[in-house]
Amino acid sequence: MSASVAEPPPALSRKAEFKAAKAELLARFKSANHVTPLMHALSRATDDALRSLWQECGLPATLALVAVGGFGRGELSPHSDVDILVLLPDAHASELDERIERFIGMAWDLGLEIGSSVRTVDQCIEEASHDVTVQTSLLEARRIVGSTALFERFMLRYREALDARAFFQAKVLEMRQRHAKFQNTPYSLEPNVKESPGGLRDLQTILWIARAAGFGSSWRELDTRGLITDREARELRRNEGFLKTLRARLHVIAGRRQDILVFDLQTQAAESFGYQPTSAKRASEQLMRRYYWAAKAVTQLATILIQNIEAQLFPATSGVTRVLSPGRFVEKQGMLEIAADDVFERHPDAILEAFLLYEATRGVKGLSARTLRALYNSRDVMNNAWRRDPRNRHTFMQILQQPEGITHAFRLMNQTSVLGRYLLNFRRIVGQMQHDLYHVYTVDQHILMVLRNIRRFAVAEHAHEYPFCSQLIVNFERPWVLYVAALFHDIAKGRGGDHSALGMADARRFCREHGIEGDDAALVVWLVQHHLTMSQVAQKQDTSDPVVIKRFAELVGSERRLTALYLLTVADIRGTSPKVWNTWKGKLLEDLYRATLAVLGGAQPDAHSELKTRQEEALALLRLETVPPDAHRALWDQLDVGYFLRHDAADIAWQTRVLYRHVAADTAIVRARPSPVGDALQVLVYVKDRSDLFAGICAYFDRNGLSVLDARVNTTRHGYALDNFIVTQTEHDVQYRDIANLVEQQLAARLAESAPLPEPSKGRLSRLSRTFPITPRVDLRADERGQYYILSVSANDRPGLLYSIARVLAEHRVGVHAARINTLGERVEDVFMLDGTGLSDNRLQIQVETELLRAIAV
């Protein structure tokens, strides 16, 4: 007898057929530029499958199956939820419930992500009356199968109950709340293509409120209604098409619903659009720039449309409040409104005047839809002649020099694309992502964030944030010079070459064209050239060395330049990412500022006088602590000049008070306290020195989730290590006072052990670091005096990295004299001062460098 092949179960057969049909549609989409046909085809295929299941389950003709939400629009992304409503007549047999459950279960078995509700007409209206999400999903309801009469009765009741004004207010509030979750910016590193500001949800919201108001349900209908122009309708369709296509491609690449443009998928998504990497830009950076421009346009046009719809739904009871510029601008209900639609065509210089008035006029909270539209449609007016017009140059400088409102004005100029059309080089960096692992903003947003930070120094209500910066800027004449420097400090990013040098040339040209002369022009250009210098000196050089301070003072040359560079540096670091700035970096910069200011004021950077001053200050503090006179000598006699220069008087006094009775201790002494500088723990270690000591301490910190910010390593004349560490806990909301005792006990016990150094843990990289790894670099060279060797390490940050470095050095018996741990978001740029013994051997140098590269490799 011949064996027969068993038929697959009907459910499996249906699922296989549906999956094959969907796969065929997706295969066609891969070579298509437009996604709308795919979305409609997926919706039709889903309709057909659901109709078939409905009939198979024997559901009566008195019920109706209704598509809602995006499915109701007839648009399905490859892995979108399929939202359905089973509409029941007021009275129905209870046995229907079992059939409906079977229908929904079979839909799930088919592979559909079903979102279902089962309601009567009355229940639908009741739910919609107190839940705007339900009300919205029903707005685009579409019958798939079942009773037409029941569906039409439902839609009639729904429209009768719909209050267009209340719906508008609810959806606008919902949109504001949604935007707030994304920090009110489309410029996220990993934007949500659907939900982020400028995403698909904004476009859908506009069409929802327009449909509810009876104004139309497509961009063409809104154009016909006069709510948007032909040009705006084209822009909306173009950007909507791009966002829909991007979302669908994310779904296909991920093989599931995926609306967030995560790092891991950005390169594949870019390649699916045909972007190719160049020497200057990754493919992903090109895609992200396209996305940011689309989101920016959507945000701009959405603002115009919402204001226009609001004006029709809520006709103004009052007209013009006051004339702000005769024949050009008026204030209308708190908004800056053009006096006529062709103002910018007749008076191109009114374009920048609009922002000056917005900035300088109390009570004006924004630009009206009419003004925004006129700006949007005046792009051709903003040409070379407009940029060269002396009136515009004068107005631009006035905007920079106003006492308040500068940040808001520049943000609005960027949102409306006016800033990029006035400064063409600024336009080149709009939407340009920086995959350097520590900037979390696009270049244009970073620049405006730096401008905002400098402005906040000068605002009294923010003086508590950075008191020293606020104190300095109060006495800084013509602070607008700093704003110009902020605008240009990174304007040349992404062009290739040294962005500081290229930006210098742009800044010099701007100053020449805008009448900035003499010392002010020289300061702007110098700040752009050296905007990274102070940070590098403070974080990577030994600022206890008088030679370093003297060299930096010679570069700066004057107190005004020093203050300007300090303020720009603090604002710049704070403008890269919320994670990069910390109080320790603030202390390093402030210490460098004060030391340099003393030299500029005539003080000689003399090690002997500095040593004497610090010792006297430390002794005064010890007397307050009731430490016996001369008790400090036993310890201080064992310390070299370098120790006193590398520690301030407060640290010297604390360490002396802890150690003066234990100068010849047999066991390790470990003391910890909350850092006086800020949110960190200061750890003192005093123990007989050995070659693996630094590595052993780093191993303990690594195993216990403590990150080292700074290490100052000293060896006494009688062979003890006196090491000082500043560490932070990776967990949030840690109370350092609570963990100080635990660190003291555990670290002392660890140092008492004679166990070999453990293997470093290769901690996991973040997704950002995995997607955009940097090439690790190691540079080992003798310092200028030949006293120490300077080791510079640049790598992706990860747990265990510092210990991996320390272990290699310990294995080669290379002593660490000092360490500056500089974490910049997802990357580190660490600098170590090493004892030079043995490193003069080139073979050892090469071996150490090679092993370090291997240890820090991703």
UniProtKB/Swiss-Prot annotation:
Notes on how activity is controlled: Uridylyltransferase (UTase) activity is inhibited by glutamine, while glutamine activates uridylyl-removing (UR) activity.
Annotated catalysed reactions: [protein-PII]-L-tyrosine + UTP = [protein-PII]-uridylyl-L-tyrosine + diphosphate; [protein-PII]-uridylyl-L-tyrosine + H2O = [protein-PII]-L-tyrosine + UMP + H(+)
Primary role: Modifies, by uridylylation and deuridylylation, the PII regulatory proteins (GlnB and homologs), in response to the nitrogen status of the cell that GlnD senses through the glutamine level. Under low glutamine levels, catalyzes the conversion of the PII proteins and UTP to PII-UMP and PPi, while under higher glutamine levels, GlnD hydrolyzes PII-UMP to PII and UMP (deuridylylation). Thus, controls uridylylation state and activity of the PII proteins, and plays an important role in the regulation of nitrogen assimilation and metabolism.
InterPro entries documented for this protein: ACT-like_dom_sf, ACT_dom, HD/PDEase_dom, HD_domain, NT_sf, PII_UdlTrfase/GS_AdlTrfase, Polymerase_NTP_transf_dom, UTase/UR
UniProt organism field: Burkholderia mallei (strain ATCC 23344)
Organism ancestry: Bacteria, Pseudomonadati, Pseudomonadota, Betaproteobacteria, Burkholderiales
Domain HD: 443-565
SMART domains given in the database record: HDc
Protein name as it appears in the record: Bifunctional uridylyltransferase/uridylyl-removing enzyme
Region (Uridylyltransferase): 1-324
A Pfam family of this chain: HD
Family stated for the protein in its record: Belongs to the GlnD family.
Domain of life: Bacteria
Keywords noted in UniProt: Hydrolase, Magnesium, Multifunctional enzyme, Nucleotidyltransferase, Repeat, Transferase
Cofactor: Mg(2+)
Positions of the ACT domain: 682-761, 790-858
Biological process annotations from GO: regulation of nitrogen utilization
